């Protein structure tokens, strides 16, 4: 925690092709070692691939895939009298986006397809159709929150 108050959030500039801040955030998260050009090539290639398979506009299909992965609830550990409880909490909208982006990229990287463009496109398509690793992660998170609903009164 900084002593001089909250650190201001930096605004992410919209991406050059779709003029979307969401796409820009995704590219920044996908990037390794500052190689933004490579990350953009992967992202835009995956979107074109997704658009061909769904027949929808690329950005709209991406946003729908992202919406299908966004968690509504999560559990946070809370210590009460020596015991740690998993307390279900609602997820803030900015965190929903961050988690869904992180999960999509993580599960895309762990897929078996050849090349990151194909892996990401396949994960987008699965998320678009409510399947895949990222959607399963969201469902697991919701299941954990549901199972620990009894501890909801420990919310702070």
From Swiss-Prot:
UniProt KW Chloroplast keyword: no
Keyword tRNA-binding in annotation: yes
PROSITE patterns: RIBOSOMAL_S7
GO molecular function: rRNA binding; structural constituent of ribosome; tRNA binding
Domain of life: Bacteria
Keywords: Ribonucleoprotein, Ribosomal protein, RNA-binding, rRNA-binding, tRNA-binding
Cystine crosslinks: none
BP GO terms, sorted: translation
SUPFAM superfamilies (UniProt xref): Ribosomal protein S7
Record-level GO cellular component terms: small ribosomal subunit
Pfam family membership, one: Ribosomal_S7
InterPro entries recorded: Ribosomal_uS7, Ribosomal_uS7_bac/org-type, Ribosomal_uS7_CS, Ribosomal_uS7_dom, Ribosomal_uS7_dom_sf
Transmembrane segment boundaries: none
Function: One of the primary rRNA binding proteins, it binds directly to 16S rRNA where it nucleates assembly of the head domain of the 30S subunit. Is located at the subunit interface close to the decoding center, probably blocks exit of the E-site tRNA.
Subunit structure: Part of the 30S ribosomal subunit. Contacts proteins S9 and S11.
Assigned protein family: Belongs to the universal ribosomal protein uS7 family.
The protein's name in its UniProt record: Small ribosomal subunit protein uS7
Natural source organism: Lawsonia intracellularis (strain PHE/MN1-00)
UniProt lineage: Bacteria, Pseudomonadati, Thermodesulfobacteriota, Desulfovibrionia, Desulfovibrionales
Gene: rpsG
């Amino acid at each position: 925690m900084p002593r001089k108050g909250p650190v201001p959030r930096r605004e992410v500039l919209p991406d050059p092709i779709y003029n979307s801040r969401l796409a820009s955030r995704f590219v920044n998260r996908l990037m390794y070692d500052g190689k933004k050009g490579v990350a953009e090539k992967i992202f835009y290639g995956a979107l074109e691939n997704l658009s061909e398979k769904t027949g929808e506009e690329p950005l709209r299909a991406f946003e729908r895939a992202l919406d299908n992965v966004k968690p509504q609830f999560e559990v946070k550990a809370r210590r009460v009298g020596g015991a740690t409880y998993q307390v279900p909490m609602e997820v803030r909208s900015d965190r929903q986006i961050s988690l869904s982006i992180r999960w999509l990229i993580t599960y895309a990287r762990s897929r078996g397809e050849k090349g990151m463009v194909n892996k990401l496109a396949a994960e987008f398509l699965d998320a678009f159709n409510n399947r895949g690793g990222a959607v399963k992660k969201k469902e697991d998170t919701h299941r954990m929150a549901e199972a620990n609903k009894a501890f909801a009164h420990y919310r702070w």
